[in-house]
């Protein structure tokens, strides 16, 4: 079970009179068709796992909904706390500079809502497993192609 799943499982177990918490997964955004599908699939997974919880996607730029729109959606669904999780591997300027600005703006717009910036994806042993899997996929393809040559 992932760290986010554990956090959401905890949220799932809290009494209904507790603070209503939303999770907003934030990706970069792209003009390329289907470029945002991975993030949307992750959000869809968690929406199905916890259908009574608020789980939404938003994008830093280009793609809708924007981060302010995502915060608005969460508040519109009754969120009293919003945990913003950056769907970014690296702690570059978007994570260090841009996202905190959006968090500050969200807090200013909704002073009674607790808007929290969570950690970006960063390094995790499962990332190593995924990279290893991708390397082996390519190597297996090369072996298949080499064996297919006359």
Predicted ranges, named:
Residues 1-150:
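Active-site-proximal alpha-helix that buttresses catalytic centers in soluble enzyme cores
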């Amino acid at each position: 079970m992932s760290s986010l799943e554990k956090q959401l499982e905890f949220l799932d177990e809290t009494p209904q009179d507790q603070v209503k918490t939303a999770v907003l997964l934030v990706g970069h955004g792209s003009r390329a068709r289907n470029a945002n599908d991975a993030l949307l699939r992750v959000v869809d997974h968690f929406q199905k796992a916890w259908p009574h919880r608020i789980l939404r996607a938003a994008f830093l730029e280009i793609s809708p909904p924007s981060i302010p729109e995502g915060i608005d959606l969460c508040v519109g669904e009754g969120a009293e706390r919003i945990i913003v999780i950056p769907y970014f591997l690296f702690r570059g300027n978007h994570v260090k500079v841009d996202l905190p600005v959006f968090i500050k703006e969200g807090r200013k717009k909704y002073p009674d809502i607790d808007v929290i910036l969570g950690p970006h994806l960063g390094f995790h042993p499962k990332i190593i497993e995924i990279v290893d899997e991708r390397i082996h996929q390519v190597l297996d393809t090369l072996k298949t192609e080499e064996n297919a040559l006359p």
